[in-house]
């Protein structure tokens, strides 16, 4: 009975119904604005790592679309006549993921890294004059030591989306 009385008694947190409804709406709206992009990332990751997807690859593995994207291609990239696309979803929850890039001097390429909020946090490629070498995508707060010569790329989330674009020359 004491619990029922305490729950029914007004306190500093009790709001009139119209204010409680407005606050609930505002909190729901804020949750949507902040959370929708994370939900979208999860949907994209599940689609792109699905073995039946047209441009699929398991976590921590790159897959390159075979050929140029066309308007009928079932991928999430813009069709054009001079770019080959690739993608990878990284899981950094167990630690850094390393990527080695060869020397590329004869064409434009870029690998864009985004966190789960789809904010770009790093580029590797000719766009930013990257050199051949090994790059480490680091999870938030990681304090370990990398091998000599490895370039660290700090993510703000344990999930990372890599989008590769490579210019192809007409043949």
Model-derived regions, located:
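Sec-dependent signal peptide recognition
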Residues: 1-2
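A compositional/structural signature for long, glycine/proline-rich flexible linkers
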Residues: 10-171
């Amino acid at each position: 009975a004491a619990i029922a009385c305490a729950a029914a008694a007004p306190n500093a947190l009790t709001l009139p119904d119209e204010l409680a409804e407005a606050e609930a709406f505002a909190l729901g709206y804020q949750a949507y604005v902040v959370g929708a992009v994370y939900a979208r990332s999860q949907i994209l990751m599940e689609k792109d790592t699905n073995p039946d997807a047209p441009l699929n690859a398991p976590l921590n593995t790159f897959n390159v679309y075979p050929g140029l994207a066309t308007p009928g291609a079932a991928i999430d990239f813009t069709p054009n006549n001079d770019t080959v696309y690739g993608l990878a979803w990284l899981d950094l929850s167990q630690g850094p993921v390393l990527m080695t890039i060869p020397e590329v001097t004869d064409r434009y390429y870029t690998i864009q890294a985004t966190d789960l909020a789809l904010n770009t946090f790093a580029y590797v490629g000719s766009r930013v004059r990257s050199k051949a070498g090994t790059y480490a995508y680091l999870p938030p707060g990681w304090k370990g030591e990398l091998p000599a010569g490895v370039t660290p790329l700090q993510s703000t989330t344990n999930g990372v989306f890599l989008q590769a674009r490579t210019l192809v020359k007409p043949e």
